[in-house]
Amino acid sequence: MDSTYMPLAAKAGVLSAKVVPSSGGETEFADMRAAYDELAPSTIEKISKLSAFHSLYQSQAKNGYKVETGKGYGYHTEGAPLRPLIKKHPVTGRNALCIGRHAYKIPGMDDKEANNLLDSLLEQACQQPRLYKHSWLPGDLVIWDNRCVLHRACPYDVSEPRVLQATRISGDPMSEFAETGADDLASAFEPSKANTLSL
């Protein structure tokens, strides 16, 4: 799910291919509804009342990057949104896992245990037959429901250009807004008056 690190997450995502490499660079999409459906009842019970904070700072730090607050989309001072691990789709009512590389801390749980749980859920979720891999051609356009689908780029030779234009469609505040807590990798925390949550 994209933009879960923003207080108001997107409800849909769009990618349009302009220039593609000769090989690799596909985009994989994973269905988080199907991933939820495959969970053991004991796992569903364990995670049903859990939530995780989501942060672009944290996910980028895992990859060795440090970005200053205010230096791009997602690097804001509104804090890290707290989102339930199980999300009910506002239109279909179907449950989906709300995880991904931006999820990093579960309140009330040791950080190592939380990371292990989140990594395990993500690993299980992103397996066949829940994956679709799109091999890009110039001019392709893919639209997905961001409320229940994860996506990621596949490796490619970075000496070749790969240009995809991304667009996000803003979510409905009733279903996509999440209160935030302070993000220790951001230089400031300026929540809205409704946000009283802290880490």
Where do the protein language model's features map onto the residues?
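Non-heme Fe(II) oxygenase catalytic core, chiefly the N-lobe of the double-stranded beta-helix
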Residues: 1-141, 146-199
